[in-house]
C-alpha cells in the first residue's frame, strides 16, 4: 500500500499543479518529471542511470512522432490561413442554407471534425464558432455547441495522434485498436448531431423537419470511420468521416431545398480557386493515404528508411526506431510545402510560417516531452504496475467502469487526449491483464472517456471562452 501511495505522487502533483494551482503546463510537467525520477529512485530502487535513460527515451518519443505531427498539423493550418484558404472554405460553407440547425451540422460537426482531424489544438472550436457567430448565433451558444461537437473527433484528431500514441505506449497493434475505438464511439457519433440540433433549434420540437438530415450526418461520420480504421489505420478515420459527413449533409440539403430559391453551394467561389486554396488539405489526405498500409508496396519501401537507437539501459529495454518517411508528420510537411509553392508562395514565406509555428509551440514541446518522459519512468520503474494492481484490488470487476473516468480525469488535467493516453494508457493494459480481460477493449473504453471530457479540456475552454469574451466586449 505504501508503494501505491508513492506511485501516485506524480499524478497527484499534476492534478494539483494544473487543476488547482493553475501552473503553466510546461513548468508543471517538467517539475512532475523531476518528482517522478526522485520517487522512482528513492521509493522503487530504480538506478539513476536507468531513470535518466528512461526519461530520455520518453522525451525522444515525445518529439518523434508526437511533437513532429503536432508541428506539421499546425503548419498546414497556418499556411492555409496565410494563403487565404480558410477564408475561401468559410465562404463555401456559409452559402449552403439559411437553416441554422443544418449549418451547425455542417460547420460545428462536419467542418469542426475535419479541423480536429487535420490540426486540433482548439482550431476545431474557434473557427466554426467564429463563423456561427458571424451568421448571427449568440457567442456563448456557438462556443457551447462547438465544444460538444468536438468530443468524438478527438480520438483520431491531429492525423490519428491520440490512438497511435496510445498504441505505442501500450504495445497494442494500432489498426486493431483503431477499429475498437471506432466501434465504441459509434453510438456517441450518431447521437451528438441530435444534441447539437436540439441546442440550436427554437421551440419545443427543434428536431422537426431535420431528423433525416441529422441522422444521415451522424451515420455519414460513423460508418466511414469504422471502415477506414479497419483498412487503413488511425491516421484517416476522422478526416474521411468528417468529409463524408459534410458531403452527405450538403447532398440532403440540396435534395430538401430543390426548387427553392436557395443560394448555390459555393456562392461566388470558382471551382479552380476552391481547389487551389484547399490544396494543402487535399494533398495531406492523398499523401497520408498513399503511404499508409492501404498501399503496402509504397509503405514497406518507405519504412526501410529508418534509424534504430538503444536509449534505455535497464531491464526489458527495446531499441527505439524512427521511421523517417512513413511518419504522418513528414507527409504533412511535404504536402504543405508543395501546396504552398503551387499557390504561389516562396520558400522564404513558407519557411517563415514554419519557423513561427516552431516558436509558438515551444512550451507545448516541453510539456509533451516532459509528460511522455514522466510516463516512461513510471512504466519502467514499476510505478504504473503498482497502481494497476492496487486499483484492481480495490475495484475488482468494476474497474472497466472506472477506466473512462480515469480517461476523463487525464484529459481534464493535461488538456489533451494524446497526453492523457501517454499518462494513463499503459495502466489500462496492466489492469486488463490482471483482470484477464481484452486489453484492446479496455484501452478503447479508456480513450472513450478522454473524448467525453475533451470538450472541457483547458485548451478548448480557453479558446472558446476567449473568443466569446472578445465578442461580448464589442
From Swiss-Prot:
Keyword Transmembrane helix: yes
GO molecular function: lactate transmembrane transporter activity; solute:proton symporter activity
Sequence intervals crossing the membrane: 4-21, 28-48, 63-85, 105-127, 142-164, 177-199, 209-231, 238-255, 281-303, 324-346, 387-409
Membrane topology note: Multi-pass membrane protein
One GO CC term on file: plasma membrane
The keyword Membrane belongs to this UniProt entry's keyword annotation: yes
Keywords, alphabetical: Cell membrane, Membrane, Transmembrane, Transmembrane helix, Transport
Localisation: Cell membrane
Domain of life: Bacteria
Chief location category: membrane
Role this protein plays: Plays a role in L-lactate utilization.
Family from the record: Belongs to the lactate permease family.
Protein name in the entry: L-lactate permease
Amino acid at each position: 500500500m505504501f508503494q501505491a501511495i508513492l506511485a501516485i505522487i506524480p499524478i497527484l502533483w499534476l492534478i494539483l499543479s494544473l487543476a488547482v494551482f493553475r501552473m503553466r503546463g510546461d513548468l508543471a510537467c517538467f517539475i512532475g518529471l523531476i518528482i517522478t525520477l526522485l520517487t522512482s529512485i528513492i521509493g522503487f530502487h530504480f538506478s539513476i542511470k536507468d531513470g535518466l535513460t528512461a526519461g530520455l527515451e520518453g522525451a525522444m518519443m515525445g518529439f518523434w512522432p508526437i511533437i513532429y505531427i503536432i508541428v506539421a498539423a499546425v503548419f498546414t493550418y497556418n499556411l492555409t490561413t496565410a494563403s487565404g484558404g480558410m477564408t475561401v472554405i468559410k465562404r463555401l460553407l456559409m452559402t449552403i442554407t439559411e437553416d441554422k440547425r443544418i449549418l451547425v451540422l455542417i460547420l460545428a460537426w462536419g467542418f469542426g471534425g475535419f479541423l480536429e482531424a487535420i490540426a486540433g489544438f482548439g482550431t476545431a472550436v474557434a473557427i466554426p464558432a467564429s463563423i456561427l457567430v458571424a451568421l448571427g448565433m449568440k457567442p456563448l451558444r456557438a462556443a457551447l455547441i462547438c465544444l460538444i461537437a468536438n468530443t468524438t473527433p478527438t480520438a483520431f484528431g491531429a492525423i490519428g495522434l491520440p490512438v497511435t500514441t496510445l498504441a505505442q505506449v501500450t504495445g497494442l497493434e494500432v489498426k486493431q485498436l483503431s477499429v475498437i475505438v471506432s466501434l465504441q464511439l459509434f453510438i456517441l457519433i450518431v447521437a451528438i448531431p441530435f444534441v447539437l440540433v436540439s441546442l440550436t433549434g427554437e421551440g419545443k420540437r427543434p428536431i422537426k423537419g431535420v431528423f433525416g438530415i441529422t441522422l444521415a450526418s451522424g451515420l455519414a461520420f460513423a460508418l466511414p470511420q469504422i471502415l477506414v480504421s479497419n483498412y487503413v489505420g488511425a491516421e484517416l478515420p476522422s478526416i474521411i468521416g468528417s468529409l463524408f459527413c459534410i458531403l452527405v449533409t450538403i447532398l440532403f440539403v440540396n435534395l430538401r431545398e430543390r426548387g427553392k430559391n436557395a443560394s448555390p453551394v459555393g456562392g461566388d467561389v470558382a471551382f479552380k480557386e476552391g481547389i487551389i486554396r484547399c490544396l494543402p488539405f487535399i494533398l495531406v489526405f492523398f499523401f497520408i493515404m498513399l503511404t499508409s498500409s492501404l498501399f503496402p508496396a509504397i509503405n514497406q519501401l518507405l519504412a526501410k528508411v529508418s534509424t534504430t537507437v538503444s536509449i534505455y539501459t535497464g531491464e526489458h529495454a527495446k531499441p527505439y526506431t524512427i521511421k523517417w518517411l512513413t511518419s504522418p508528420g513528414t507527409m504533412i510537411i511535404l504536402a504543405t510545402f508543395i501546396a504552398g509553392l503551387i499557390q504561389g508562395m516562396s520558400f522564404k514565406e513558407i519557411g517563415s510560417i514554419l519557423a513561427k509555428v516552431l516558436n509558438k509551440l515551444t512550451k507545448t514541446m516541453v510539456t509533451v516531452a516532459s509528460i511522455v518522459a514522466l510516463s516512461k519512468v513510471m512504466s519502467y520503474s514499476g510505478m504504473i504496475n503498482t497502481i494497476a494492481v492496487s486499483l484492481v484490488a480495490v475495484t475488482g470487476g468494476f474497474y472497466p467502469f472506472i477506466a473512462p473516468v480515469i480517461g476523463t480525469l487525464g484529459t481534464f488535467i493535461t488538456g489533451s487526449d494524446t497526453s492523457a493516453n501517454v499518462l494513463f494508457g499503459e495502466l489500462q493494459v496492466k489492469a486488463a491483464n490482471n483482470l484477464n480481460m481484452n486489453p484492446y477493449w479496455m484501452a478503447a473504453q479508456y480513450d472513450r472517456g478522454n473524448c467525453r471530457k475533451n470538450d472541457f479540456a483547458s485548451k478548448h475552454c480557453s479558446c472558446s471562452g476567449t473568443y466569446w469574451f472578445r465578442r461580448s466586449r464589442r
